[in-house]
């Protein structure tokens, strides 16, 4: 599906505030709320809009430990590892990477004990290097793709 300039404007507004009412979007781009809703539904159906979400403050939620784990596979057990990753809520992000490591995992946990348990469970798939975050200095949600600048 190709998006046109109107769809792009709708996406920009949703990107700034996913809770915005269709009617309000329509007022800003000179369409009816129903027409906006139809366009949003079409973008959802075509996978342009995948989900709506919230951003929470991990520290305020009690996730006081953030770690980055470079993971090195022992063998070709990638499918098993990917299944394991999918079941673990402590792993907030997982990326297949180039270089010496196979994967980069971002882990957020309440305690060192939970982190240690996860790391012990990972050992059946390979080895890791652990980097603890001391302080988050920047967190950016990439909205530049939606910028008209």
Curated annotation (Swiss-Prot):
Molecular function via GO: sequence-specific DNA binding
Top-rank lineage group of the source organism: Bacteria
Keywords per UniProt: DNA-binding, Repressor, Transcription, Transcription regulation
Gene Ontology CC, one term: cytosol
Ranges of the DNA-binding region feature: 22-41
GO biological process: response to amino acid
Domain annotation HTH asnC-type: ranges: 3-64
InterPro entries: AsnC-type_HTH_dom, Dimeric_a/b-barrel, Tscrpt_reg_AsnC-like, Tscrpt_reg_AsnC/Lrp_C, WH-like_DNA-bd_sf, WH_DNA-bd_sf
Name the record gives this protein: HTH-type transcriptional regulator LrpB
Taxonomy of the source species: Bacteria, Bacillati, Bacillota, Bacilli, Bacillales
